[in-house]
């Protein structure tokens, strides 16, 4: 799964989180969050953790094909 960078950045802004604080909130290494932000494909569970930390539904940040 790939996150939509624009949707993810907007959700981060709404939650007042930078990549480092998002990583801490999602309980994952900052490198993983940076990979998500760069458009790398990640496991659904990883995207789910990011979405939960942002308080959004995973479908809200998934890149549409």
Model-identified regions with their sequence ranges:
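A short, Lys/Arg-rich alpha-helix, primarily the initiator
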Residues: 1-21
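Key DNA-contacting residues within the recognition helix of helix-turn-helix
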Residues: 34-35, 48, 62
């Amino acid at each position: 799964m790939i996150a939509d960078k624009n949707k993810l950045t907007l959700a981060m802004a709404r939650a007042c989180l930078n990549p480092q604080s998002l990583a801490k909130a999602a309980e994952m290494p900052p490198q993983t969050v940076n990979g998500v932000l760069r458009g790398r494909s990640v496991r659904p569970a990883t995207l789910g953790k990011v979405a939960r930390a942002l308080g959004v539904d995973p479908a809200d940040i998934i890149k549409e094909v």
